[in-house]
Amino acid sequence: MRIAVRLDDITPDMDWEKFGEVKTLLDNAGVCPLVGIVPDNKDPNLHKQESKKDFWRYFATLKDKGWSIAQHGYTHIYTTKEGGLFPLNDFSEFAGLSYDKQLYMIKSGKEILRSHGLDTDIFMT
């Protein structure tokens, strides 16, 4: 059996207790998930506790162990009331913005990840 697991909204100040519980389950099952890291989180709803000081190194280690890293948006701030191509919501960080603005946000986020040793070619919103 093949299993794919995707974890979104990964930030230095997420709920680390909940993340640890999920990580334990995944480790016990031998599953290496795709984790979507928000490069420059500005979403107050994702601020759950103090930032983990070794966040970037921690996820570089997980990447070395087989976890896949994705860029999950840029700041996680919804700036439009657009649903995009697959409208699950009527708001978005990217949908409805100009190509140039979206490209700038993607490149900026990618550079943040790269500067912390997490180079990836996977992008998800």
Regions found by a protein language model. Name each.
Residues G96-T125:
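Catalytic domains of cell-wall/extracellular-matrix polysaccharide-remodeling enzymes
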Residues A4, L88-S92:
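Short glycine/proline-rich turn/loop motifs
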Residues F59-A60, F91-S98:
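Acidic, His- and aromatic-enriched active-site or binding-groove loops in soluble protein domains
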Residues D8, H72, F123:
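Conserved, mostly hydrophobic/aromatic
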Residues M1-S68:
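Active-site beta->alpha N-cap acidic-glycine motif
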Residues I77-N89:
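Short, flexible, mixed-charge acidic loops at enzyme active sites
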Residues S68-H76:
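Histidine-centered catalytic micro-motifs
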Residues V38, Y74, T125:
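Short, well-ordered beta-to-alpha junction loops that form the rim of enzyme active sites
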